[in-house]
């Protein structure tokens, strides 16, 4: 009996054109051992397994959809992540925190910027280390986009992908927003968001 063809969330070509599978020249053994890293190019660049990325996006969408959206904080300090995070939160209803993460945001209720949340979602655990550390102290689960060189400590659910590229981040957050809304029954299984992935993309200033 022939193996059933795997069904991707978006056509394979979309993943490839957005550079979602492109990693760095450094590699985290933890990710290698779990089969996330598919190959190494002659120039040393690590390449993610697109099927693994797609599978993790499905898992992450189911996981995030279980939480009340207003109890989910999505954070990034990476400028290319600002627009994708803001658009994601607009559609899904989560809280967006872009830019600097002020120490104590998750741990000190006496601060005016304190936020009490049930789930933290970060774009890059290396850049967003303060948020990840505070979430760990408070017992808050952490979902993270991880590149090939990303440390895995304190991350409860990893989504391997290019978490640095403008087009990659736009597509990843577009897919997640759509899939979460489908999981919540707010979109039909074959229904798309009313805007294309390009609307999630940070514009370059000339």
From Swiss-Prot:
GO terms for cellular component: small ribosomal subunit. GO terms for biological process: translation. It comes from the Archaea. InterPro entries: Ribosomal_uS2, Ribosomal_uS2_arc, Ribosomal_uS2_euk/arc, Ribosomal_uS2_flav_dom_sf. GO terms for molecular function: structural constituent of ribosome. Keywords: Ribonucleoprotein, Ribosomal protein. Signal peptide: none annotated. Belongs to the universal ribosomal protein uS2 family. This is Small ribosomal subunit protein uS2. It comes from Pyrobaculum neutrophilum (strain DSM 2338 / JCM 9278 / NBRC 100436 / V24Sta).
């Amino acid at each position: 009996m022939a193996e059933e063809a795997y069904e991707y969330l978006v056509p394979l070509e979309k993943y490839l054109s957005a550079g979602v599978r492109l990693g760095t020249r450094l590699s985290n053994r933890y990710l290698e051992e779990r089969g996330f890293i598919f190959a190494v190019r002659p120039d040393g660049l690590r390449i993610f397994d697109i099927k693994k990325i797609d599978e993790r996006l499905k898992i992450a969408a189911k996981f995030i959809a279980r939480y009340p959206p207003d109890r989910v904080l999505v954070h990034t300090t990476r400028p290319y992540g600002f627009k994708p995070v803001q658009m994601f939160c607009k559609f899904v209803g989560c809280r967006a925190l872009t830019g600097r993460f002020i120490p104590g945001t998750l741990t000190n209720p006496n601060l005016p910027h304190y936020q009490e949340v049930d789930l933290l979602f970060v774009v890059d655990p290396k850049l967003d280390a303060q948020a990840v550390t505070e979430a760990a102290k408070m017992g808050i689960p952490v979902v993270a986009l991880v590149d090939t060189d990303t440390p895995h400590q304190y991350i409860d659910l990893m989504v391997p992908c290019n978490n640095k590229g403008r087009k990659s981040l736009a597509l990843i957050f577009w897919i997640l927003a759509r899939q979460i809304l489908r999981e919540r029954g707010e979109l039909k299984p074959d229904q798309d968001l009313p805007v294309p992935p390009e609307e999630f993309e940070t514009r370059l200033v000339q």
